[in-house]
């Protein structure tokens, strides 16, 4: 059946042929365009209507700060230990991959918790603690992540405001097997650089504090311990966003990977989507790697209730099990990386996308504030 999608504020119309519900999924050469609203607001309303006690799960988690401080101290200790070790030695690279990348992935996701104000009551305290947590990353990152991530939540799938989405150029040039391998190896750079080319945010005093503090700390570290210590931070950061088990969450959260994401109890019609459910664009993972990543695998739960801290997301799933158990789930982050790269049906195009609410290049004012 022929169909069209046109946003009411846009002159552009997308034409496509709607496949039968039971047809097999084919390799894409464009994104999954939709004119429907993202599903999380609707599901949140339904859950709150049936289980109003869920509101008691919201709020900050004070003990998280102690874990974050422990990870920062761990990274500082290893950086000091490796201060005289050659960067390209097996000892250096093994520690950077096994411990450093895992720790820095935890730091990425601690900053993610802080971006939702889930460690302290006051937003400013969360922002400043994120600057401290940023230390092992080696480059200033936390202040920019927060506003872009707020846009990702508020405008999921928006072609201009959700900078988590790959661009058309990425889809066009990186959807082959070598291209996907390149994307998976260097995805940290795509996530770091892509937002600046899509949507500009306001540079605030928090950004300045983040940049100045990180540069001063790096300078002191190099002066006292040498370049290899800082190199440990940088290499750990790169590996944390490369071919690392914990990095699988970057792809697993929102890519429609047809061979891996299946309903918990059955696979219907050879697709990853139950006929009773709307097309899925967010996926949860309930495996053991959640213990190292602040339960970021509970991603449907997180998008439904972004103000519930990581320690209480499993309880949300337990209370509202009938809303979450039937949804397609990711079974393995390592498997996601493998299936994404080597399965032809999974490409960079495999994301749900919506026509933008703002014109390209529009400077965001208050939309990105938490």
Swiss-Prot record:
Keywords: Lipid metabolism, Membrane, Oxidoreductase, Sphingolipid metabolism, Transmembrane, Transmembrane helix. GO terms for molecular function: sphingolipid delta-4 desaturase activity. Pathway: Lipid metabolism; sphingolipid metabolism. Its EC number is 1.14.19.17. A motif (Histidine box-2) lies at residues 149-153. It is a multi-pass membrane protein. The chain crosses the membrane at residues 68-88, 92-112, 128-148, 173-193, 197-217, 220-240. The keyword Iron does not apply. A motif (Histidine box-1) lies at residues 112-116. One of its GO terms (cellular component) is membrane. It is an enzyme of class 1 (oxidoreductase). One of its GO terms (biological process) is sphingolipid metabolic process. Pfam families: FA_desaturase (PF00487), Lipid_DES (PF08557). Its main location: membrane. It is found in: Membrane. A motif (Histidine box-3) lies at residues 299-303. It comes from the Eukaryota. It catalyses: an N-acylsphinganine + 2 Fe(II)-[cytochrome b5] + O2 + 2 H(+) = an N-acylsphing-4-enine + 2 Fe(III)-[cytochrome b5] + 2 H2O. Belongs to the fatty acid desaturase type 1 family. DEGS subfamily. Delta(4)-fatty-acid desaturase which introduces a double bond at the 4-position in the long-chain base (LCB) of ceramides. Required for the formation of the monounsaturated sphingoid base (E)-sphing-4-enine during glucosylceramide (GluCer) biosynthesis. This is Sphingolipid delta(4)-desaturase.
